[in-house]
UniProtKB/Swiss-Prot annotation:
Cu cation A1 binds at H161, C196, C200, M207. The gene is MT-CO2. It comes from Balaenoptera musculus (Blue whale). Residues 46-59 are mitochondrial matrix. This is Cytochrome c oxidase subunit 2. Its EC number is 7.1.1.9. Belongs to the cytochrome c oxidase subunit 2 family. Its cofactor is Cu cation. Component of the cytochrome c oxidase (complex IV, CIV), a multisubunit enzyme composed of 14 subunits. The complex is composed of a catalytic core of 3 subunits MT-CO1, MT-CO2 and MT-CO3, encoded in the mitochondrial DNA, and 11 supernumerary subunits COX4I, COX5A, COX5B, COX6A, COX6B, COX6C, COX7A, COX7B, COX7C, COX8 and NDUFA4, which are encoded in the nuclear genome. It catalyses: 4 Fe(II)-[cytochrome c] + O2 + 8 H(+)(in) = 4 Fe(III)-[cytochrome c] + 2 H2O + 4 H(+)(out). Binds a dinuclear copper A center per subunit. The keyword Mitochondrion applies. GO terms for cellular component: mitochondrial inner membrane; respiratory chain complex IV.
Length: 227
């Protein structure tokens, strides 16, 4: 989860988020090298006393500064497209959960079970217990099994919302009349926090998301107790 004065990303909890972090580092390295080269050239131009006003044509230079940026863009685009297609893949999910956005709470339905659904509201600050996080705790957490592919169906009952959990690399728009889907898989147990990431009204900041990823045996006990 996030912490005060954090500069980087949250710790990756899913394979997709790990890929996104690697892509971020890959792109940042390219940008850093280009920026260093440009800064070096600018420094040379500002400090040198030599002038060259007779150059009218430089085809070699023009060829290089056309081909080189194209190669750099390809090196950025290929891994980006790979991750984009990975995020859209939904292959034989073990569990499907339907998420509906409301002003201003989330409702969840485990579609593989006959009657397992609930609403998830933020716990007011006055009702928090010691150790709980302000504006992030909910009365009903979304309990899911870890190390299993889970499909999330996301939509909205009223206005635009966005269901986002940064440590899992998830951000899916909840659009009225449209059903979007995404997949998640956690590589470790724990509590993972998110929030609505689309301005949806006066209480937009009070729509937290809490996922509790647990081993399968604990999930089965929880689901049995909820039915």
């Amino acid at each position: 989860m996030a912490y005060p004065f954090q500069l980087g990303f949250q710790d990756a909890t899913s394979p997709i988020m790990e890929e996104l972090l690697h892509f971020h580092d890959h792109t940042l390295m390219i940008v850093f090298l280009i920026s260093s080269l440009v800064l070096y050239i600018i420094t040379l131009m500002l400090t040198t006393k030599l002038t060259h006003t007779s150059t009218m044509d430089a085809q070699e230079v023009e060829t290089v500064w056309t081909i080189l940026p194209a190669i750099i863009l390809i090196l950025i685009a290929l891994p980006s497209l790979r991750i984009l297609y990975m995020m859209d893949e939904v292959n034989n999910p073990s569990l499907t959960v339907k998420t509906m956005g409301h002003q201003w709470y989330w409702s969840y339905e485990y579609t593989d079970y006959e009657d397992l659904s609930f609403d998830s509201y933020m716990i007011p600050t006055s009702d928090l217990k010691p150790g709980e996080l302000r504006l992030l705790e909910v009365d009903n957490r979304v309990v899911l099994p870890m190390e299993m592919t889970i499909r999330m169906l996301v939509s909205s009952e009223d206005v635009l919302h966005s269901w986002a959990v940064p440590s899992l690399g998830l951000k899916t728009d909840a659009i009225p009349g449209r059903l979007n889907q995404t997949t998640l898989m956690s590589t470790r147990p724990g509590l993972f926090y998110g929030q609505c990431s689309e301005i949806c009204g006066s209480n937009h900041s009070f729509m937290p998301i809490v996922l509790e990823l647990v081993p399968l045996e604990f999930f089965e006990k929880w689901s049995a107790s909820m039915l």
